[in-house]
Regions:
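Extended catalytic cores of very large enzyme megasubunits
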Residues: 1-262
């Protein structure tokens, strides 16, 4: 069974998401979560019935059914908590959308979700960032210029009272750098870490000792290890502030003779 997200995209139904949301609502009011599995199964059966009858299953359909099920089984405090959870999620979506709507093709929603998750405090709200960003963003600018404005907004919001904006600015700077790097690599026809090592060696920008002492399979394995430290919650890039990442990019990356970082 597939469900339809708010974006219109489809994804496989996963009952664990319902269970997690209800468990969070139960825990927030001090209720034991023992009934969650049974309630989730009941909701899943109703969704299957609706789907079999030819109905499309939207995210809102599921959330409405969760509320109805909690009310049916006399969980007033829990349903109130779930409603507040829905409202909170809606506000976060709205805050992200206000920013993403200012870009024509660059998709920042995933990055903004990560920021909301890692910086839940009120002083790091995306609404505040949007107000700062919109104060000097011009209409009709390119996505590249808009991203530069967003980085500038986050940097300018860094204060003694809210110092972690510098980490948020760093994330946007990394997005900008990745876009530029991808374009450079595509122009050079470089599609892998191994090919990058080969190119740098051939151009005299990197010692030949790596390609001489390690096979392609070994270098590919190194690339996987590096990539594992560059994604998810363990992303080491998240340890860098804006100023430290900016310094790293400007001074310590290997560059071509045309001063292009690779």
């Amino acid at each position: 069974m597939e469900i339809i997200k708010r974006t219109g995209q489809k994804e496989a139904f996963r009952s664990i998401k319902i269970a997690d949301a209800m468990a969070a609502a139960f825990k927030s009011v001090g209720t034991d979560t023992g009934a969650v599995e049974r309630l989730t199964a009941e909701i899943e059966e109703e969704l299957k019935r609706l789907h079999a009858a030819g109905n499309e299953i939207h995210i809102e359909t599921i959330q409405d059914l969760v509320e109805k099920t909690l009310i049916k089984h006399n969980y007033p405090a829990e349903v109130k908590s779930f409603i507040l959870y829905r409202e909170s999620r809606a506000k976060k979506r709205s805050a992200r959308k206000r920013i993403t709507d200012t870009f024509s093709s660059l998709d920042l929603d995933g990055e903004l979700k990560s920021i909301q998750k890692d910086f839940p405090e009120e002083e790091y709200s995306l609404d505040a960032l949007y107000h700062k960003y919109s104060a000097f963003k011009k209409e009709g600018v390119s996505d590249a210029d808009a991203l530069s404005d967003l980085i500038r907004a986050a940097v300018e919001m860094t204060t003694q009272e809210a110092p972690r904006w510098e980490y948020i600015a760093s994330r946007f700077l990394m997005v900008e750098f990745r876009i530029k790097l991808k374009a450079h690599l595509e122009r050079l026809g470089i599609q892998s870490f191994y090919e990058k090592i080969r190119y740098l060696t051939q151009e005299g920008l990197y010692g030949s000792y790596i390609s001489e002492h390690y096979s392609k399979a070994e270098i590919d394995s190194f690339a996987e290890t590096i990539a594992s430290c560059d994604s998810g919650e363990k992303n080491r890039n998240f340890l860098l502030t804006y100023s430290s990442l900016d310094l790293l990019i400007r001074r310590y990356l290997i560059r071509t003779t045309a001063n292009v970082p690779l």
